[in-house]
Amino acid sequence: MKIQLMLTTLAGITSCFAFGEGFDYSFNLLSDHSVASNSAQDDNQAHRLLFTTEWQWQMDDRWLVAGNLKAFRGDNGEGLTENLQGISNIDAEKFSKIYEMYVQYQFNAETRAKCGQVDANLEFAFVPVAGAFISPPLGITPTAIALPTYYDPALSCSVFYEPEQGFQWMGGVFAGRDHLDFAEQFYVVEGRYVTADTRWSYGFWHHNGDWEVLDQNRIKAISGWYLNYQRQLNDDWALFAVWSSLNDEVDITRQHHMLGVVRQFEPHQLGLMVSEVTQRYSTKDYLAEVYWQHQLQPDLALQPVLQWVNHGEIGLKNQWVWSLRLNWSF
């Protein structure tokens, strides 16, 4: 499952160390341990670790070179539930690799260009206020099946126009074949409207490769759209909503809808969300999550999580999933 991994979730409050002029680096360890009821596996538990090393070199006021390495070890927790939306945004098979490597040029305070190997979901189709949830749909919506994100970013070039408030515009082209080959392309364009307490984002994506529709015919390309909203109600409460669609019948997924709230009271944070995916052949697939995040130290956070999975497939029992996330930066 393609899922999103937001840097705010992975890095938490990151400790950075200077190494020469303009050079910074940081390390992060993210640990998830989950226990599921009614699991089809013999073992109803999964424990996994994601290590991240990030670095950046600010060459001058305009040029930035940055990248990160990631390594995943442990169990792929997707097998605990086998639901459409997943339960952890770090689940994967074992890997170690250069995850991102890019160059960024800042034209002015509002405009920048970014080229290299990039996780698209760190720039497009995300909801900032929802960054602490561990559920995959809080990153990338399940309908954007071609978006190059965790755990396979892609070569790309993107341009961003981002004034502090008002309308923002951005777009990018990504290698659409094996994440390295531009013989096929993935395009995404996004517009935002940002005020002091509100953020709307609306986007359209298109992949021009050959995708097989469910009746075994061939089509040239697929596309979809998304609409994200978040509002800061006051210093403590924020709410968010997501609505997205896959336009072509190359997957059982059709639309994704999500609502959630976040309550911030230092050193704690509380989050609650409900996510729904409509499908072609099955009833709706639901996922709900509530978490309590406690900042034990500036570089160490503990986060108990409870999830409820309502399967869209007939015959599968609903499931409860208890998880404990540890986020340590050093």
Give short role names for the model-derived ranges.
Residues Q41-Q45, T149-Y151, G176-A183, N217-K220, ...:
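Solvent-exposed loop/turn segments connecting transmembrane beta-strands
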Residues F19-F27, D61-V65, A109-T111, L155, ...:
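Outer-envelope beta-barrel architecture signal
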